[in-house]
Swiss-Prot record:
Family label: Belongs to the UPRTase family.
Entry-linked PANTHER family: ADENINE PHOSPHORIBOSYLTRANSFERASE, URACIL PHOSPHORIBOSYLTRANSFERASE, CHLOROPLASTIC
Organism: Pediococcus pentosaceus (strain ATCC 25745 / CCUG 21536 / LMG 10740 / 183-1w)
Record's signal peptide: none
InterPro entries xrefs: PRibTrfase_dom, PRTase-like, Upp_B, UPRTase/APRTase, Ura_phspho_trans
EC number in record: 2.4.2.9
Gene Ontology molecular function: GTP binding; magnesium ion binding; uracil phosphoribosyltransferase activity
Modulation of this protein's activity: Allosterically activated by GTP.
Sorted UniProt keywords: Allosteric enzyme, Glycosyltransferase, GTP-binding, Magnesium, Nucleotide-binding, Transferase
Cofactor binding description: Binds 1 Mg(2+) ion per subunit. The magnesium is bound as Mg-PRPP.
The protein, known as: Uracil phosphoribosyltransferase
Cofactor(s) demanded: Mg(2+)
Residues that coordinate or bind 5-phospho-alpha-D-ribose 1-diphosphate: R79, R104, D131, P132, M133, L134, A135, T136, G137, G138, S139, D200
Cited function: Catalyzes the conversion of uracil and 5-phospho-alpha-D-ribose 1-diphosphate (PRPP) to UMP and diphosphate.
Length: 209
């Protein structure tokens, strides 16, 4: 079974409270999501493999640690996932960026895939799938399906807010992946929104309704 972890760093929790507030402007929401994503990148990359390298400091030669060259990809689920890309890429600047397009049918709450564009060597990369909300889990499951179909093996899912129902569904569908979130909220309401949640992340990021 993959790992499930709530990232409870004080800075992450503080900033998450700011964007939950309905009075948070689009500009502020976008900036803070970016900041949280950078902090999350630090946490979710803790186990990246290291190797010994010989360097020369101004004083002399030394054996030190360096990331071993594991390739990374950041794959947002469109469109809300785009808000998390730049923040994660701040700490992982050599990451390739893929995209998976999904939209949710407001009647059935089921996701539909409409676009997939990934690095050609996705099977060799550690993949961070990003989406601010893990609600029903439908979009996350379909995104991981699409990645595995194209050869991805090392997959981690990163969200800002998750519902227990979504976590359970994703774990049951893909028990091998790790799931990280900044908050595990109470439940889904009858409209499929996370309670208390933060509203529609895509609309709040892009100023649409």
């Amino acid at each position: 079974m993959g790992k499930f972890e709530v990232l409870d760093h004080p800075l992450i929790q503080h900033k998450l409270t700011l964007i939950r507030d309905k009075h948070c402007s689009t500009k502020e929401f976008r900036e803070i999501v970016n900041e949280i994503s950078t902090l999350m990148a630090y946490e979710v990359s803790r186990d990246m493999p290291l190797m010994d390298v010989e360097i020369e400091t101004p004083i002399g030669k030394s054996i030190q640690k360096q990331i071993s060259g594991k390739k990374v990809a950041i794959v947002p689920i469109l469109r809300a996932g785009l808000g998390m890309v730049d923040g994660m890429a701040e700490l992982l600047p050599v990451a390739r960026i893929g995209h998976i397009g999904m939209y949710r049918d407001e009647e059935t709450l089921k996701p539909t895939e409409y676009f997939v564009k990934l690095p050609s060597d996705i099977s060799e990369r550690q993949v961070f799938v990003v989406d601010p909300m893990l609600a029903t889990g439908g979009s996350a499951i379909m995104a991981v399906d699409a990645l595995k179909k194209r050869g991805a093996k090392d997959i981690r899912f990163c969200s800002l807010v998750a519902a227990p129902e979504g976590v359970k569904a994703l774990q049951e569908a893909h028990p091998d992946i790790d799931i990280y979130t900044a908050a595990l909220d109470e439940k889904l309401n009858e409209d499929g929104y996370i309670v208390p949640g933060l509203g529609d992340a895509g609309d709040r990021l892009f100023g649409t309704k």
